């Protein structure tokens, strides 16, 4: 199955945006979730966990700070990969003036649904460009 970014909704938040390209609810037979996350400059995704799924983060571009399992933060940059076991608390912050672009997976998929309840969520329909706002 081919999925184009133009055919996928954009979830926009105060800290950045996400496009989920593959989810169990959107792609028949899929058991994992895969998407692109953009963390805006100087922003971040606060401490949280995914009780039922491991997460893998691959840094496409940019730099930031990552915390895993309430441990000490460490630097992440283009080419780095971070594995987060199921249930482990973690956070990701962009520490530069450029966007931090990530590929994120959840296994098993479905944990992305929790973001639908985020108070700062704005959902942009497929094909509509999400407006970026400086905080």
Language-model segments: residues:
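A short, N-terminal "cap"/entry segment at the start of jelly-roll beta-barrel domains
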Residues: 1-32, 46, 117-135
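Conserved hydrophobic/aromatic beta-strand scaffold that supports enzyme active sites
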Residues: 10, 20, 34-38, 56, ...
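Short strand-connecting beta-turns/loops that link adjacent beta-strands
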Residues: 27, 52, 71, 97-98
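Short glycine/proline-enriched turns and hinge-like loops at secondary-structure junctions
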Residues: 30-32, 49-50, 95-96
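A short beta-strand-loop-beta hairpin characteristic of the jelly-roll/cupin
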Residues: 44, 51-78, 88
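Ligand-binding loop in jelly-roll beta-barrel domains
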Residues: 73, 77-78, 86-112
